Amino acid sequence: MKSINPDPNGLSIGYFFPAGRTNHVWSDEAARRTPQMNRHNLMALAQAAEDAGFDSLFIADNWSGHQRAAERGGHQAPAFHAPLLAMGIFAVTDHIGVITTLHTTHHKPAHVARMGATLDAFSGGRWGWNAVTGHSGDEAALFGEPYVEHDKRYAMAAEFVDVVQQLWREEEPIEFVGKFYRAQGRIKAPRPVQQPRPLIVSAGASPAGTAFAADWCDALVTLARTEADVRAADERLQALVAPTGRTVTSWPFAICIVRDGEGEAQEEYEQLLKSLNADAAWEIASDILGSIETAKAMFDKLGRDEAVRAIGSGSAMLQLIGTPDQVAEQLISLRRNVGAGGVLINFPLWSPRELRNFGGVLRRLEEAGVRTSPASRNYSW
């Protein structure tokens, strides 16, 4: 058995793994410099992340939506299905965790319970679940289902996770009769290695999404542009967590470029932004602003051009752009001064070189005592 991270002072560093092509910087130059999406390149990237000392890989996923301009620009689509990609990664790594996105809206609880138990057992306790409800009407249409409104999706998700956890926990058949789901019996799958259950995270920062995370998850992934935004989001989360007695931490997204020389990382970033793909960025912006509550609150007051640049450049999230020392200082501050439990790192260029560059940051974090490498500990995450 393995337990979820018991270190209250540890900062979990995840890598936003590219299941599709370029992530969160909608630049034609970034797309041009992106390697082919094939087994060799993706497995090499996963191994480089493990060698650098990352705690986890985070694989986002969706079934449909905002694809046409994105595909023309070489951005994020087509994409590999997260749980299937994870199996390949587990086969070529030993320590790094993999968090896969699985929708509550488009699965049955038994599907996720069996997939999750299999992934966790196969990996030796290295699997985590990003539980999302889905936000796209295109996805509902793809499955031939009616579109479910926002708060109802989270009410359904709470019941869904309850059923999944019962199926993981109980050796005897369960009998569950809820408002949205019914389940009777047990799954034919190995027990999860992580106890009391695998890690669960979510990324919904609306009131309903935050309440869901407080009740059912271990971490809430947040979209924040500044340390003050991270602190405010965490305070809202902790106000809901406190009555439950649970521990739920905030994991903000960050866009990151690390270079050894002063100013080199910022220069690289500016070069990428010179070829910002406005069509692809606006398609993403329109979809996000129309359906994702977190982003609507952040960008509602922006005009088209400003929203396109903010979303297309990755400036909708924290920016960690600098030397290893500079980036490490920012991460240490997020842990010590803001209370972040983790950070999800997104590189606009995905290659083993970027991960090796970030390895220097991770070593500095260990020296500062804010994290422990997964290769040297006996617990997950």
PLM regions and their residue ranges:
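N-terminal beta1-alpha1-beta2 module of alpha/beta enzyme domains
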Residues: M1-V92, Q195-P198, A375-W381
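An alpha-helical appendage that flanks or caps ligand/catalytic pockets
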Residues: K2-R21, E50-D51, H150-V193, R225-V338, ...
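Acidic (Asp/Glu)-rich catalytic clusters
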Residues: D7, E50-D51, M87-D94, G116, ...
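Hydrophobic faces of well-ordered beta-strands that scaffold small-molecule active sites
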Residues: I13-Y15, L57-I59, V98-T100, W127-A131, ...
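Active-site mouth loops of central-metabolism enzymes
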Residues: V25-H40, T101-A110, P196-A205, C256-R259, ...
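Short, acidic/polar
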Residues: Q36-A49, G204-F212, T323-L334
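Conserved, mostly hydrophobic/aromatic
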Residues: A49, G53, I89, L119, ...
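Hydrophobic, small-residue-rich alpha-helical packing segments that form membrane-like cores
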Residues: K108, A121, G137-D162, A189
